């Protein structure tokens, strides 16, 4: 069974990567700036950084993947949308790359986000429709993934979110934490996750519904920082250190400066993940769940999307 599954996935891998490369070539051209929009509507200046646990920091940015993590950004005249997904690594024991499932989930979210009717107010709908798209295929990609979507309605500058699992986002205003998403877990290191299983019966996997995602609404203002990331960041870098690092970039709108901030967070997460004596957020979670963990960080794939709210200047 496993060899059959692996053979099918190899063909799907090539097809999916080819499709993603085509859509990446168009999307990366507008990665930091918004769609045309109405004059004066706020927009997001956005940057992305990450690294695979097994490879270098620039391992797969062009494919919108860092290891089993995947991401997307989308800009239209009505909405700015960002998303991250973390493929659940346990499937690797069956020869299945959950990064493919995460990639396809983000691909469809990006696709639906570009519809003219989408105005950023219902990111949960993107998640529901994308998951349904994957499950509805005759021979779907198999795997599991967390997902976090954040969208900005450009007309009223209100942020809407849908977060399922232990990826997440936070908002910083005036150097202080304004909001942080709620983590959703079944147990220690067992996040809520969207899942597609093979035709064979699988009883030992979590299969959560996208409707379980935590949804929030938050008015934003010029200069607010929005950080979206997988647990490779949040499991290794304490919230206080994230806020301190990003506080230096409050009000910054130059893409180069934001990229420097994102780079710093990713390097910090990587260094702390391999520190054996550091009391990481992951180690503290283990203690809270009364799980025997020797301490230190948690080596993992890391994906960070950092954005700031900007308003076009009058001529």
Swiss-Prot record:
GO biological process: dephosphorylation
GO CC annotation: mitochondrion
The entry's keywords: Hydrolase, Magnesium, Manganese, Metal-binding, Protein phosphatase
Cofactor(s) needed: Mg(2+); Mn(2+)
Gene3D superfamilies linked: PPM-type phosphatase domain (3.60.40.10)
Entry keyword annotation includes Metal-binding: yes
Annotated residues for binding of Mn(2+) 2: 86, 231
UniProt keyword Ribosomal protein present: no
Top class in the EC scheme: hydrolase
SMART domains (alphabetical): PP2C_SIG, PP2Cc
Domain PPM-type phosphatase, chain residue ranges per copy: 54-309
Binding site for Mn(2+) 1: 86-87
EC numbers: 3.1.3.16
Catalytic activity of the protein: O-phospho-L-seryl-[protein] + H2O = L-seryl-[protein] + phosphate; O-phospho-L-threonyl-[protein] + H2O = L-threonyl-[protein] + phosphate
Molecular function via GO: metal ion binding; protein serine/threonine phosphatase activity
UniProt record similarity statement: Belongs to the PP2C family.
Protein's UniProt name: Protein phosphatase PTC7 homolog fig
């Amino acid at each position: 069974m496993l060899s059959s599954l692996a053979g099918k996935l190899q063909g799907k891998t090539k097809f999916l990567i080819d499709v993603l490369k085509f859509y990446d070539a168009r999307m990366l051209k507008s990665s930091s700036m918004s769609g045309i929009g109405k004059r004066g509507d706020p927009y997001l200046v956005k940057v992305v950084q990450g690294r695979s646990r097994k490879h270098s920091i620039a391992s797969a940015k062009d494919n919108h993947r860092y290891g089993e993590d995947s991401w997307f950004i989308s800009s239209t005249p009505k909405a700015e949308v960002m998303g991250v997904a973390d493929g659940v690594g346990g499937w690797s024991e069956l020869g299945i790359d959950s990064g493919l499932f995460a990639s396809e989930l983000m691909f469809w979210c990006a696709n639906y986000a570009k519809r003219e009717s989408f105005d950023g107010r219902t990111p949960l709908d993107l998640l529901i429709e994308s998951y349904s798209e994957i499950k509805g295929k005759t021979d779907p990609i198999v795997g599991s993934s967390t997902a976090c979507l954040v969208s900005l309605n450009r007309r009223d500058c209100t942020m809407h979110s849908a977060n399922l699992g232990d990826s997440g986002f936070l908002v910083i205003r005036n150097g202080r934490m304004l909001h942080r998403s709620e983590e959703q877990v079944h147990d220690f290191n067992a996040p809520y996750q969207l899942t597609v299983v093979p035709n064979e019966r699988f009883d030992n996997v979590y299969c959560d519904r996208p409707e379980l995602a935590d949804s929030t609404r938050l008015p934003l203002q010029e200069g607010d920082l929005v950080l979206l990331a997988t647990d490779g960041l949040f499991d290794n870098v304490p919230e206080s250190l994230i806020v301190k690092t990003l506080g230096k970039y409050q009000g910054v709108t130059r893409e180069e400066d934001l990229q420097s901030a994102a780079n710093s967070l990713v390097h910090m997460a990587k260094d702390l993940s391999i520190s054996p004596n550091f009391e990481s957020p992951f180690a503290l979670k283990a203690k809270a769940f009364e799980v025997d963990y020797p301490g230190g960080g948690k080596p993992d794939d890391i994906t960070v999307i950092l954005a700031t709210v900007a308003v076009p200047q009058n001529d």
